[in-house]
Amino acid sequence: MESALVTKTDVMHQLAKDYVVKGLGAKNFDAIPYADDVVLRAPLCPGGSQNPLFGKENIRQQWWAPLPSLVGDVTFIDSYVNEEETSVTAEFHCQILQPVCVLRIIDRFKINEEGKIIEQENFFDPRPVTNP
């Protein structure tokens, strides 16, 4: 009989997939396991990636607020966990409804011991949104 042992790596891969599918795809911010003091860097944040947003509720209000009306379908492609099991990346495609385009995204998440996201950085070319 094969054991169904769930490893930390398995949990991190699932977190990345759930972020894409249950968070962005289902338009459910509360499905994303952000720590209260999370830091987010994203090209479409006010000030871009060089100006991080701090705090879960601040991210909900500034970054997340327009997303449910802008995001269409998402397609999870793959994830990667680093050797130290402290970070996971998710590769996915995100359909944007206005202007119509598909963003090819890789997001990196740093995870704490409680399994919460403490840092997130989004990597993608924003030109399809900013210069359609």
Locate the predicted segments by residue:
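Residue-level detector of alpha-helix boundaries and kinks
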Residues: 1-4, 15, 44, 48, ...
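Short acidic-aromatic low-complexity motifs
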Residues: 2-37
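A beta-strand edge to alpha-helix "cap/lid" segment located at domain peripheries
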Residues: 2-6, 61-132
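Short glycine-/acidic-enriched loop or helix-start segments at secondary-structure transitions
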Residues: 9, 50, 129
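A structural signal for well-ordered alpha-helical scaffolds and beta->alpha junctions
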Residues: 13-16, 56-60, 102
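A solvent-exposed, acidic/Ser-Thr-rich amphipathic alpha-helical stretch
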Residues: 28-86
